[in-house]
A protein has these predicted regions:
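Conserved beta/loop motifs at nucleotide-recognition and modification sites
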Residues: 1-200
Length: 200
């Protein structure tokens, strides 16, 4: 089942019905945000972080994690990083044994011919979301949303942030964190922000 990443940003709860979910694409910052939302949303659950290479070397790593129930937590969340088509057979095998576990896969760009991408797009029980590179419009929305209520947030300040981050969501978030730390009174000073942002 295909989900649009911009809709997930607004309504992240919509993925709760999927036992398996694949995030793919070149936008590392967006995938990082989704991972953080999953961690926040599932604080009381055990969260495991695995990589495809370790699972390919020993598929029992994943199979055991799915079959073994935790003594402390009812549910388990598993992140599998840097996946590609090589993991498809293992995922297909594991999904049959899943009960309360949820698995989230993270991949770089997958072309339309990708078997993994096709599997997730056609499945009714799995979800998939493309994380495409941000453009100036999406970056502006992020800045406006996170700095909402700040006096002095002008087009000039927004443009300065965009120029200094090169449309990289991770860098934008870091710069916004700096601004929030520096301007605790929520009054942005253009001279100070220029110095702050050029201090990369």
């Amino acid at each position: 089942m295909i989900f649009k990443s911009y809709i997930l940003e607004e309504n992240f709860q919509s993925i709760n019905n999927c036992k398996l979910f694949l995030f793919y694409g070149e936008n590392l910052g967006l995938k990082k945000e989704f991972k953080e939302k999953l961690r926040t949303q599932n604080k009381i659950q055990e969260i495991l972080n695995l990589f495809q290479d370790e699972i390919i070397k020993n598929k029992n790593v994943l199979i055991n994690e799915v079959s073994n129930k935790s003594l402390f937590n009812e549910k388990k969340i598993i992140f599998i990083n840097q996946v590609n088509d090589k993991i498809l057979d293992i995922v297909d095998e594991v999904i049959e044994n899943m009960q309360d576990e949820r698995i989230f896969l993270f991949s770089d760009i997958l072309d339309k011919k990708s078997k993994l991408r096709s599997y997730f797009e056609k499945s009714k029980s799995c979800g998939i979301a493309a994380c495409y590179q941000d453009n100036e419009i999406t970056i502006r929305k992020i800045i406006m949303k996170k700095l909402n209520g700040y006096q002095g947030l002008t087009a000039q300040v927004t443009n300065l942030i965009i120029q200094n981050t090169g449309l990289d969501r991770d860098k934008v978030n870091n710069e916004i964190d700096k601004i929030i730390s520096c301007f605790k009174d929520k009054k942005i000073d253009l001279e100070k922000i220029d110095l702050l942002l050029n201090d990369l």
